[in-house]
Curated annotation (Swiss-Prot):
Residues 1-22, 275-327, 373-453 are annotated as: Disordered. This is Ribosome biogenesis protein SSF2. One of its GO terms (cellular component) is nucleolus. It comes from Saccharomyces cerevisiae (strain ATCC 204508 / S288c). Present with 1350 molecules/cell in log phase SD medium. It holds the Pfam family Brix.
Length: 453
């Protein structure tokens, strides 16, 4: 398949500064048990479809890969978030960990249940499949049920936990600018809803479909039967009134998926209508109308007698809004999450909040001391490692310097030897020349070299 061409001449290119500010993500599986689970593998692939386009879609994990390998590569690749799916070997529970790189924090959720994208499509009458054009822009994030303000029945710790979760979800996608963002570019919705009673968080992924609002299906059948005699009239023998046919009272909840709800109908001003009306007004202003002398004379008389009312510019400039319906088609996957804990760092820091385990003040102090000792030991090992690396580098540099010195001395010795051999060869050649010309008499007849007359 040929590669899709990207416009570069007329489209504004993203600067390196803007590219650096865009959050990127990795969706990975960690652990031997999760790598062997086929349904979890498909869930990871579906979740990568949600995080497109700023994610590694074709990332392949190996059994030898550890979490540290992915964390190390987050810096050079500019990855800001890690979504880690793990499965417990003992209980088989699936967990989702969302970590902010490089300093954390890490939010751990327990996946209570999930449904794959293919399972969602089986229950839909008209399922939707994503194209390459549908994932060119990130989805619209909708958070429902989260509150960052303190209520009467909540304490400060719950409010802080809510703020951490909301900020974590808000930063996984780049922020939208309403003045610059085109509405046609938003084609997906990622909805995160929290149940205030149970505390469960549900995730849904939808596709946005905008349609022109038309008349109902039954009225359309009546109009077709009127205009076309071959079309049959709807059967009305079971209807008590014509309103039951038009308003669909008998159908109830068994309406078609193509039918549009009244709550989803909005009035939208189309930009194409604005451009068309603007072009028509500009053409009418630019095209001159030729008039004869009699018409000009009559026009002047009419202008003197009657004052014509000119239409207001506001009435002509505003286009008539159209009714459009917004329909959401679920793409999948579905996830139901339950918060477990929040910890500092990337899966290796101090536990800031735990949903099921409550510690006393003495236990918290002991954990803080243990964590501080662990951090000191880690810093000490890091310094020792840096010193060892510096020593190895110094030994390597000294060895390299000695090798260069030996090479230089060897080159100088070879140069001196070649000089002695050259001097000896020069002396030998001069002596051989003397011996060769010793038999030639000195008073050689000069007439042999005289000019020819």
């Amino acid at each position: 398949m040929a590669k899709r061409r990207q416009k570069k001449r007329t489209h504004a290119q993203i600067t390196p500064e803007q590219e650096r500010d865009i959050p990127k993500s990795m969706v990975i599986r960690v652990g031997q048990t999760s790598l062997a689970n086929h349904s979890l593998n498909q869930l990871v692939k579906d979740f990568r479809q949600i995080m497109q386009p700023h994610t590694a879609v074709k990332l392949k994990e190996r059994k030898s890969n550890k979490l540290k390998d992915f964390v190390v590569m987050c810096g050079p690749l500019g990855v800001t978030h890690l979504f880690m799916f793990t499965q417990s070997e003992k209980t088989g529970n699936v967990s989702l960990k969302i970590a902010r790189t490089p300093q954390g924090p890490t939010v751990t959720f327990q996946v209570l249940d999930y449904s794959l994208g293919r399972d969602i499509k089986k229950f839909l009458k008209r399922p939707k499949s994503l194209n390459n054009d549908d994932v060119l822009n990130p989805p619209l994030l909708v958070l429902n049920g989260f509150s960052t303000s303190k209520r009467s029945d909540e304490d400060d710790q719950d409010v802080n936990v809510e703020k951490v979760i909301v900020s974590m979800f808000q930063n996984i996608f780049p922020p939208l600018n309403p003045a610059r963002t085109s509405l046609n570019s938003i084609k997906r919705i990622f909805m995160i809803n929290k149940d205030r009673e149970t505390g469960e968080i549900s995730m849904r992924h939808y596709f946005i479909d905008i349609r022109e609002v038309e008349i109902s299906r039954n009225l359309k059948r009546l109009y077709k039967a009127k205009n076309n005699l071959s079309k049959t009239v709807p059967n009305l023998h079971r209807k008590e009134d014509i309103s039951s046919l038009i308003l669909d009272h008998d159908l109830g909840a068994y309406t078609s998926e193509s039918e549009i709800e009244d709550d989803a109908i909005v009035r939208v001003v189309d930009n194409q209508d604005v451009k068309a009306k603007h072009s028509q007004t500009s053409l009418s202003q630019k095209t001159p109308v030729k008039m004869t002398d009699n018409e000009e004379r009559e026009k002047g008389i009419e202008e003197e007698d009657v004052e014509m009312e000119e239409p207001k510019p506001s009435e002509n400039s505003q286009p008539t809004p159209r009714k459009k319906a917004i329909k959401l088609t679920e793409l999948g996957p579905r996830l139901t999450l339950k918060l477990v804990k929040i910890e500092d760092g990337i899966c290796s820091g101090k536990v800031l909040h735990h949903e099921f385990v409550q510690k006393s003040s003495e236990e918290i102090k002991a954990l803080e001391k243990r964590h501080a000792a662990k951090m000191r030991l880690k810093e000490q090992r890091r310094k020792e490692q840096e010193e060892n690396i510096a020593k190895k580098k110094a030994v390597k540099d000294a060895k390299k310097q000695r090798k260069l010195e030996r090479r230089k001395a060897r080159a100088e010795e070879q140069g001196e030897g070649q000089g002695k051999d050259g001097a000896m060869s020069d002396d030998g050649s001069s002596s051989s020349e003397d011996e060769h010309y010793s038999d030639v008499p000195e008073d050689l007849d000069s007439d042999l070299f005289s000019e020819v007359e």
